[in-house]
Amino acid sequence: LVNDVADIAVHSLKDVPALIDPQFSIAATLPREDYGDALLLREGLTIDDLSKNLKIATSGPRRKSQLLSMNSKLNIVPIRGNIQTRINKINTDNLDGLIVAKAALNRLKIVHPNMYLFSEDQMLPAAAQGAIGIEINTVELESQLGNLLKLLNDESTYQATQIERMVVASLEGNCLSPISALCKIDAQNAELQVRVSSQDGSKVYNEEVKFNLDNKIDALESFIETLIKNGAKEIIQQ
C-alpha cells in the first residue's frame, strides 16, 4: 500500500498497529473467528499441571504476563515460525506447552490431541484477535472500493474491533503491549472488557463497561479516562 503496488492489504487485524497512517484505513472486517487463546500441551499433561514449573512457549508479552499472573514460576520462552513449526517444537525443543490463537488452528483445520482453551477470565484476548481486516488507501480508493467492501464487511465485528483498537491506541500501546481488550456487541448494546498487566504478571488491572452504541464516543472517553486515572499506562510499562 505504501509503495502503491497493491490496492488492498488483508491482515490478521490483531497484528496491525492500533494507530495507522491517516492515509490508510481498515475499510472492512470479515466475520470474527474464535477469539480465544489455546494451550497445546505435551502428552500426559493437563491444565492442572500449569501450577508446576512448566516450560511454556509464547511469542507475546500479553500472553506471557497473564500466564505469569497464574503462576510466577512458569518458564516462559519465546517462539517463532508458522503454526505447524511451533507445534513441532513441543517435541523438538522439549516444551511442556505452547500458546496459539484458536482462530489460527481453526483456519488451518489443525486439531491438537491435547488442547485446553483458556476462558476469558484466565486469558483475555488481544484487541481484534480472530478478526481479518481489509486495509485500503482511503484517499485514493474509498470512492472506488467503498461500496464493494461494504458487501464483505461484518458490521458487528467491525464495530467491536474498532472499539478494542481504540482502547489500545489511547493507552499508547502496540502489538507487543500486555493489553487485552474484548468487546461483545448484541444489537446496539456493547460490553467491553480490558485487562492490562505488568510484564512479569505481578500487577493485573481489569476494568469493564457496558454502553449503547449510540453513546459510544462519550462512553469510551469516560472509560479510557478511568483506565488512565487508575494507572493503566504505568502498569503496562513495568
Predicted regions span which residues?
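Paired acidic/hydrophobic, glycine-rich loop segments that form the ligand-binding mouth/hinge
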Residues: 2, 7-12, 96-101
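A conserved helix-loop-strand patch within extracytoplasmic ligand-binding domains
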Residues: 13-73, 140
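Mixed-charge, polar/low-complexity N-terminal
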Residues: 6-7, 20, 36-38, 80, ...
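Short glycine/serine/threonine-biased micro-segments
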Residues: 2, 7, 58, 128-131, ...
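Small-molecule-sensing regulatory modules
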Residues: 69-238
